[in-house]
């Protein structure tokens, strides 16, 4: 999203009124444990392997993230299912999480080098996307930035770092739990807490922000909903039919074949 907005800004286009970043890395200075595994040799190997073509298998990507929390996401099921013969209980979030997708090899190689290795997105003009030089200083629009306190993929400090990069009016909110459960937290469940800091105050260190933030019970969704109302257009009636005109007809009932297809 950040690179798409930067491309549009470079072309003088501003079709977006506001943007929301959920557990997102833009500044890759703090990438947590993943930083241990990504160095020049690893990236060069991936560039040689698939930089000109091919795919990164979705299962390989899923395994990488699972082994960042091996006790919960790997060995827990080895012991319970393989050793004890227990059937894992249904878990909607993990079912969704297991639906991985393949990545184009050239994109994956580009991403590794320009983000995790060289952190080029925060260096004006260093990275190029769709023929345009990326300069996030031009992405001057209201943004809502959410980070999860126990996130093992996007550390809270990494999510917070976006407040130091994006120039527009910002709101940063921290939620309890991790990368997925922190985000998917419907208010009706009345679970967990979220933290909100002073309006417009973003010290450089995330720990300083946390020290002064106010803890509020329940989901952060209610805060986000109010923020969106202030940046959205007028409400309009929902369309009565699917598709749009003769050119964009509905293909089949939701959710569609692509949702059920395996990578």
Residue ranges of each PLM-predicted region?
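Short beta-strand/loop motif that positions the catalytic acidic residue
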Residues: 139, 145-147, 151
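Conserved alpha/beta-hydrolase "acid-adjacent" motif
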Residues: 152-158
């Amino acid at each position: 999203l950040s690179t798409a907005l930067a491309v549009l800004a470079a072309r003088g286009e501003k079709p977006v009124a506001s943007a929301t970043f959920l557990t997102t890395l833009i500044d890759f200075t703090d990438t947590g444990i993943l930083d241990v595994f990504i160095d020049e040799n690893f990236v060069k190997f991936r560039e040689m392997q698939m930089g000109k073509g091919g795919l990164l298998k979705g299962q390989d990507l899923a395994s990488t993230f699972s082994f960042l929390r091996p006790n919960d996401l790997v060995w827990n099921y080895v012991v319970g299912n393989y050793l004890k013969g227990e059937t894992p209980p249904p878990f909607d979030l993990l079912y969704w999480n297991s639906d991985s997708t393949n990545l184009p090899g050239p994109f994956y190689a580009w991403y590794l080098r320009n983000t995790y290795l060289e952190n080029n997105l925060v260096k004006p003009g260093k990275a190029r996307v769709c023929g345009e030089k990326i300069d996030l200083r031009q992405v001057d629009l209201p943004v809502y930035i959410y980070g999860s306190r126990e996130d093992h993929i996007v550390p809270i400090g990494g999510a917070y770092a976006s407040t130091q990069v994006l120039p527009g009016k910002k709101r940063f909110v921290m939620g309890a739990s991790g990368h997925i459960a922190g985000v998917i937290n419907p208010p009706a469940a009345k679970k967990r807490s979220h933290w909100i800091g002073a309006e417009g105050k973003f010290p450089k260190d995330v720990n300083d922000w946390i020290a002064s933030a106010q803890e509020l019970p329940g989901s952060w969704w209610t805060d986000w909903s109010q923020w969106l109302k202030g940046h959205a257009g007028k409400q309009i009636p929902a369309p009565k039919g699917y598709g749009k005109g003769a050119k964009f007809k509905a293909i089949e009932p939701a959710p569609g074949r692509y949702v059920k297809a395996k990578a």
